Structures are given as structure tokens and as C-alpha cells.
Amino acid sequence: MIASAPGKIILFGEHAVVYGRHAVVSAINLRCRVSVRKSDRFLIRSSLGESGLDYQRHPYVVQAVKRFGELRNIPGAEIEIESEIPIGSGLGSSAAVIVATIAALNAEFDGDMDKEAIFQMAKQVEIDVQGRASGIDPFISTFGGSWLFPERRKVEMPFKFFVINFGSRSTAEMVAKVAELRERHPEVVDKIFDAIDAISLEASDVGSAERLEELIAINQSLLRAIGVSNPEIDRTIAELERMGLNAKITGAGGGGCIFGLFKGEKPKGSFIVEPEKEGVRIEE
């Protein structure tokens, strides 16, 4: 059986959401596809290579197999992974492979998991591997759509976005950097988080592309203020602004991706994504 699950883009609220503020997050039309076939042994194939249940090479897939194995006896499986989502970019590649793996295992081994059960298991796998997790990524990958968190209220997001990928970065490092800044200047940083919170709430009900673009620019200025941008990102955003395009970091920052509203002309080095209404699904 083959299952696929979408990646995600944090539109507004990164970092602030860690401290109880709101975030707007959308599934995107880039998918991870996982094929599972019954076998007498375990074999995993992906862009990272071929292995058995090798945790070092395929931690999320191996842990998903182990968790699913607590529900159903699995003597072996051939698992093949193909993904359109750039790894380590902040676009939800890890959650997508977890969710798609669990859904494909469930279909191939005649499980009875619904989407809520798939999400709960995927969230647990994410915690197993990362130590802690908000659950936002596996939720988006499972259910699709655009949402306001933490309420999990569906929002309308009828826009396409350009995305520029600056390569992988350490989420933990960026989160720690912001935490240290907040320790030194708690009142200042909390006021910045409050402003980001207001942006997320306004963006969840935004009606026009013009207003959304303004919020993108304001949010990026606040992310720069808490130290999660870098000179390369700043230069690129400045170049885009000269072209009449606003852009902001999505995710942890320090690398990863930036995005902006797609107006018909694709900026150099970018790719185009759009919100994806459908979450995990069985392909065949």
C-alpha cells in the first residue's frame, strides 16, 4: 500500500507559539509518499540510502514501525520513501514521513486506525525521536488544511506562496537562542511575542493579499528583533522588497526557508507552494 502526507508551512507565530501565543499553519501541496509491502524482513529505501531497521539512518521510520508494531504483529516489511519536501528545511518533512509510514502500515497490515489515532501515534513518535514536540506538524500532516493554533480553528488561506530554501538549520539551537534572550530581557521579548500573537490572530481572518503582505513584513521585523534571522536572509529579503515583494522566515530561522505572497512572477531560486486541504491519504 502507498500512503502520502503533506508538508507544512508556518505562516505566522513561530517561536511565540512555544510561549503560549497563537500561530497560523497550513499544509502545503508537497507530499511524502511511503510504500509498504509485507515481507519476511525489514528493508527501508529512501534518499538517505537502503537499510534494515537502522535508527541512525531512518529514525522516524524505524520508530513509527516500532510504535505500530505495538498494535499489530509485523514480521517484516519493505518500506520505500519518496518525498517532495526538502529535508531539514522547516517544511514538515519529518512529520510527513511519520504520518505516511503509519498510514501505509495501517493499510497494508489491515489496521483499524482512523486519522485521530494516526495523529496521536505520529505525535508520540515525534516525541520519541526529538524528546519534545508541540504536535502541530503531525496534526497538519494528518488532517491537512490551514489552522489557527492552539485552538485548532480552521482558517481560509486562498493564497499561493513563493518559498526560498537556505538549507538545513538546527531548530533546537534557534529555540535555545530565543530562550536565552528572553531570560535576559523577559519583559521586552514577551511584548514582542504579544505583537506576534496579534499578527497571527489578524492573519487568521485576513481578507486581502495586501493586508497579508503587511503582516508578513511586520512579523519578519519582529523575528529579526529576537535574533533568528541572519545576514544572508536579510540580504535576500531586502532584494525582494526592492522588487515589491515582502517575505519572512518560516519555522525556526537561522537558515531553513523564507516565504512571501506569490503574485505571478517567481523570484529567482524559489519554488511555489499552495495550501493543501487534504491531509494523509491512501494512494493505492
Curated annotation (Swiss-Prot):
It catalyses: (R)-mevalonate + ATP = (R)-5-phosphomevalonate + ADP + H(+). Signal peptide: none annotated. Its main location: cytoplasm. GO terms for biological process: isopentenyl diphosphate biosynthetic process, mevalonate pathway. Its cofactor is Mg(2+). PROSITE patterns: GHMP_KINASES_ATP (PS00627). It comes from the Archaea. Pfam families: GHMP_kinases_C (PF08544), GHMP_kinases_N (PF00288). InterPro entries: GHMP_kinase_C_dom (IPR013750), GHMP_kinase_C_sf (IPR036554), GHMP_kinase_N_dom (IPR006204), GHMP_knse_ATP-bd_CS (IPR006203), Mev_gal_kin (IPR006205), Mevalonate_kinase_arc (IPR022937), Ribosomal_Su5_D2-typ_SF (IPR020568), Ribsml_uS5_D2-typ_fold_subgr (IPR014721). One of its GO terms (cellular component) is cytosol. Pathway: Isoprenoid biosynthesis; isopentenyl diphosphate biosynthesis via mevalonate pathway; isopentenyl diphosphate from (R)-mevalonate: step 1/3. SUPFAM superfamilies: GHMP Kinase, C-terminal domain (SSF55060), Ribosomal protein S5 domain 2-like (SSF54211). It is found in: Cytoplasm. HAMAP family: Mevalonate_kinase (MF_00217). Catalyzes the phosphorylation of (R)-mevalonate (MVA) to (R)-mevalonate 5-phosphate (MVAP). Functions in the mevalonate (MVA) pathway leading to isopentenyl diphosphate (IPP), a key precursor for the biosynthesis of isoprenoid compounds such as archaeal membrane lipids. This is Mevalonate kinase. It comes from Archaeoglobus fulgidus (strain ATCC 49558 / DSM 4304 / JCM 9628 / NBRC 100126 / VC-16).
